[in-house]
Amino acid sequence: MIWVVLMMAILLPQSLAHPGFFTSIGQMTDLIHNEKDLVTSLKDYIKAEEDKLEQIKKWAEKLDRLTSTATKDPEGFVGHPVNAFKLMKRLNTEWSELENLILKDMSDGFISNLTIQRQYFPNDEDQVGAAKALFRLQDTYNLDTNTISKGNLPGVQHKSFLTAEDCFELGKVAYTEADYYHTELWMEQALTQLEEGELSTVDKVSVLDYLSYAVYQQGDLDKALLLTKKLLELDPEHQRANGNLVYFEYIMSKEKDANKSASGDQSDQKTAPKKKGIAVDYLPERQKYEMLCRGEGIKMTPRRQKRLFCRYHDGNRNPKFILAPAKQEDEWDKPRIIRFHDIISDAEIEIVKDLAKPRLRRATISNPVTGALETVHYRISKSAWLSGYEDPVVSRINMRIQDLTGLDVSTAEELQVANYGVGGQYEPHFDFARKDEPDAFRELGTGNRIATWLFYMSDVSAGGATVFPEVGASVWPKKGTAVFWYNLFASGEGDYSTRHAACPVLVGNKWVSNKWLHERGQEFRRPCTLSELE
């Protein structure tokens, strides 16, 4: 058994030693296999306990029959020399063997296995991260708690439900984060399911305790008071609720007095005109970003759409593409976003993923002030960097990018492979360094990021679009395709319309890889112009 346990420790994926499982679906799939192994180990333990109990039961039944016969005529029974010998033998040795069997701990193997694997289990950060991802999906895709709880998500293959206890735990996570908006939503869902008769370890009193306070924190004093009274109907002795009731009633009486004193002049005041709705073009970026993620973005006019074409592209008469040109499609006009179809094969994708998986780490961003790499809440993914020297496939992919874009990849960054986790996203950002970030790529010595090439290495069941809030463009993932755009004008000035984001993955697994091409080496491939915005 010790040998098996040691072998399992050696064979466990080393990638699991790194925290942040919720940021990568790829690594979460390893957890599924580990949990399956634990279930198998648990079933082996149950079987061993059942076998042990079966032996004890057989022994008890045999002794029950024997003692029933012996107690009818004890003297006559032990008068038989064989019975006398067997009685001595049973009491001297066999009962000791039974004692050893009963005391034998059949759980050693399972406990050893569990102890080893527990060090690779998700931690509190993962659980909180997964919960906050659900909140993010809920907000971005306008999902109500009942839809999520019932598992009615678009594109799902494996329907899953949330219990009242699950909803309660989600509400507690939000409460701990002082996110009272989501606390209210999930505590209300837990309460609804309990009132519908769902059996749970969670009681209504606990739910109402959190719910009433969350509602109060959002300024709805009437509802908070109503919920507190409902709690006290269930538990009249609840100390905190009784205290809250007195406090809420005191606050309400003060507000009523203040309103009475201020109401005298209101009859003479004219009602202020209501403001007109704000045009979509002027909505805050966050709202535009979420609308684009839902496919509700600004639609391109028919006149502009007529300027978008599909074509065969031979890379400016590149010999590799003359007989088999690449399929190219215009996704957007300004900035010009081009999609290449069937540009990376399934076999190449699997090799890239296999190379990246062992070294996936939480994706970081460069701090604009210090230049240091750091993790941030608005980038939920894991990434790895692959050099062209590591595998012929990576080298071939790099050359394909060079042939199709006409840009030199020798000064580009390594191929970055990213896998998005639960609600995985990267909120609006620029790929290029702005003027207030002069040190962003100084260590590379290759200038600014002139262009971005992005491979989609998986289809996504729902969500996961690449969106450009400044212009209203949405580009949806399609396995085997790639999109390309310039981050800088030919003058070297940054194109601020390329500000983009990776929408949260609602359902599915999103794999991408990208290549950031830099200015150095492009002097004759993309000559500089005198006009700032050309």
From Swiss-Prot:
- What's the superkingdom here? Eukaryota
Positions bound to 2-oxoglutarate: K510
Which residues hold Fe cation?
H429, D431, H500
What tissue expression does the UniProt record report for this protein?
Expressed at least in brain, heart and lung.
Q: How is the cofactor bound?
A: Binds 1 Fe(2+) ion per subunit.
Q: Span of the secretion signal? A: 1-17
Q: Which cofactor does it need?
A: Fe(2+); L-ascorbate
Q: Where is the Fe2OG dioxygenase domain?
A: 411-519
Q: Read off the SUPFAM superfamilies from this record.
A: TPR-like
Enzyme nomenclature, EC number:
1.14.11.2
**Record's function text:** Catalyzes the post-translational formation of 4-hydroxyproline in -Xaa-Pro-Gly- sequences in collagens and other proteins.
Q: Which family does it belong to?
A: Belongs to the P4HA family.
Name of the protein in its database record = Prolyl 4-hydroxylase subunit alpha-1
UniProt lists the gene as P4ha1
